[in-house]
Structures are given as structure tokens and as C-alpha cells.
Amino acid sequence: MEARRARQKALKVKNLKNVRYMKLISVETSSSSDDSCDSFASDNFANTRLQFNREGCRTRSQCRPSGPLRVAMKFPARNTRRAANTKAAPPKPSESSANDSHSESDSEEEEDGMNFLEKRALNIKQNKAMLAKLMSELESFPGIFSGRHSLPGHRTKDSKSPRRRTFPGVASRRNPERRARPLTRSRSRILGSLGALPTEEEEDEEEEEDKYMLVRRRKSVDGYMNDDDVSRSRRPGSMTLPHIIRPVEDVTEEEIRNICSNSREKIYNRSLGSTCHQCRQKTTDTKTNCRNPDCWGIRGQFCGPCLRNRYGEEVKDALLDPNWHCPPCRGICNCSFCRQRDGRCATGVLVYLAKYHGFGNVHAYLKSLKQEFEMQA
């Protein structure tokens, strides 16, 4: 068995050696099919390949040369473009047709405007007729327009405008410019009747000396007013609250801490607050207490800013002083009510002007003006 295998192996080796030294023979065929091929060593291999490519291109219409793809496009001619544009563009209307359309539209607008005006005039006429009918019906009822009651804008031709009231000795004013103080209730008590009012010339003379206007008293019929000429009495009324004098021992530290140093610290409360005699504001801060037994009501209550700016005093010192009297009891109060009772005009916010002239409070500034006025008089 082994000998047989050795023989077969030797035979295979011999056959391989014979094939290695076999001579290559070129074979040429006359067919032009795709299965025919030439040996690579033959001289006619390149020629047969070129012939094959040429024959393939002749038989196949889809054969393309190697290289980039080239596409041929056909552009339309200029004449065709113009023709297409003329077809796409709408036909232009003629001038005559355009004028006709404009004239028709104008005539339609004019007709609409005329119709609107006619309707408006008709509506106005109907509304006026209805209003006149309603007015005639209302006037037929008795007692509707009695007295001064009348419809607004409804005035007869015979009615005249109300005349202005004129007083004897007083020049009428048609210009809204007003240099003199208006006649108030408190001023009428001081000046008396309306016939005693000063004329414009006298008022102009007073305005020339406006520097001492704050300390000068108002004129009466016979001259300047005296202290005995004040019409309003300084007695307490029936509705005046009783005056309570608080001793110094009742003043607590909490009340002293509750004293306001400026107006921004004030808290307004109309039910629990107390009223300041100077500014008339009802706030919750601590006020002064007058120790004068003849004082009445809340006349001796002053807040911190008013007492400092108007009289140069402090609320704390006033509360701790058992003999402190309020400015009205001392006769130096410069509030608007007390000055009007004395026949003088109100000062307004005078603290800034007083500080501008070098004074610390309004009372010192008014006192200096009064001294200058008395020296000149």
C-alpha cells in the first residue's frame, strides 16, 4: 500500500516538471466575441484590444469615452424670448379707456358724497324737529323749570347776562390781575363795612413799602387799628375744650422720645392725633403744654418743627419748664389766625427768608422789622 502511494507521488512530481518546461503557443481565433483573448506575451495583443473597442463602439450606441461628463443644452433664441415676454405681459389699456374709467369712478364718488350729505341734512332736520317737540312737551308741564332751574344752553333772546356786583368806592376789576388781598370773612370783621375798603391808589402806596407789610396793621376808617379796636373777643367759646395743665412730673421719657425734630417724622392720625396751633395738623407726636391757668383749649399745643422755626424754642425745654407759657398767651404768636385778629396779614412760609437775613426763626425776623418800622415812623 505504501509502495503504491510512493509511485503516485513520483508521477505527480514528474508531470509538474514537464509542465514547467512546456513551450507557450499563441492561439489566434477569428471570432470577435467577448470570450476570445490573447496571451499577454503575444505581439498582436494590443492591436486586438483596440479593434475590440472600436467594434464595441460601433455596435453600442450608449458607449461613452472615458473622461468628465459633458451635457449639451439648447438655449432658446432671442426671438423666442421676446415672443414669450409679449405673451406673458397683459395688454395695456388705451388712454381713452383709462380716461373713461377715471371719469366713471369720479362720478360714482361724487354721487356717493351727494347722497351722504343729503342723508346727513335729513337726519339733522329730523333730530331738531324731535328736540323741539320734546322741549314743547316739557315746558307744558307746570313747575319743572320754576326758579333758577333751566336747561343748559336754552336761553331766550330777551334774557340778559347777570351783572357784576359793584360796591361804592371800589373800582371794578376786569383784569384777572389782583394785587390786593381778597375780602374774606375775617378781613371783613377787621375792616368793618364794605364802604371802608381801601382804594387802589392807597393799596399801591402800601405796596411801595412792602418791606414792612408784615408788621404794619390794617387801616381802619380813622387810621391804624389799636389793640382795643379788635372786634373779635379773645374769650373762650362754648365749644372750647377745657384746658388741662400737666405737671412736669407727669412727662415721661417715652413722650420726650416721641418729639418730632422735622416734618418728615410726623404721622397723621385724625382720631388719635393732637392738633398743633401753628400748622393745624393732627399728628401723633408730642406737643407742648401751656402752664398758664388763663389759657384755654388746645391753644398752647405746638409741635417741634413749628416751635423751633417760628419761635426758636424746643418742645423738650417747654415740657420740662413748669412756668412755660405758649406764644398766644405771651402775645407773640405769628400764625395766620392770630395775625388776622391783630389786623396783620399772614406771613406764609417765612422761615427761609428769615434764615437768609441771618435770623434763626420767624419771630426774631418780625421783631427786627417791627423795630425798624417804629424807628422810621
From Swiss-Prot:
One of its GO terms (cellular component) is nucleus. Residues 199-210 have a biased composition (Acidic residues). Residues 253-377 are annotated as: Mediates transcriptional activity. InterPro entries: CDCA7/CDA7L, Znf-4CXXC_R1. Residues 148-173 are annotated as: Interaction with MYC. Phosphorylation at Thr-166 promotes interaction with YWHAE and YWHAZ, dissociation from MYC and sequestration in the cytoplasm. Residues 58-113, 144-211 are annotated as: Disordered. GO terms for biological process: apoptotic process; regulation of cell population proliferation; regulation of DNA-templated transcription. A motif (Nuclear localization signal) lies at residues 163-179. It is found in: Nucleus; Cytoplasm. Keywords: Apoptosis, Cytoplasm, Isopeptide bond, Nucleus, Phosphoprotein, Transcription, Transcription regulation, Ubl conjugation. There is a cross-link at K211 (Glycyl lysine isopeptide (Lys-Gly) (interchain with G-Cter in SUMO2)). The keyword Phosphoprotein applies. Residues 76-100 have a biased composition (Low complexity). The modification Phosphothreonine is found at T166, T199. Pfam families: zf-4CXXC_R1 (PF10497). The modification Phosphoserine is found at S193, S220. Interacts with MYC (via C-terminus), YWHAE and YWHAZ. Participates in MYC-mediated cell transformation and apoptosis; induces anchorage-independent growth and clonogenicity in lymphoblastoid cells. Insufficient to induce tumorigenicity when overexpressed but contributes to MYC-mediated tumorigenesis. May play a role as transcriptional regulator. Cdca7 expression is correlated with MYC expression in fibroblasts and is much higher in attached cells tham in non-attached cells. This is Cell division cycle-associated protein 7.
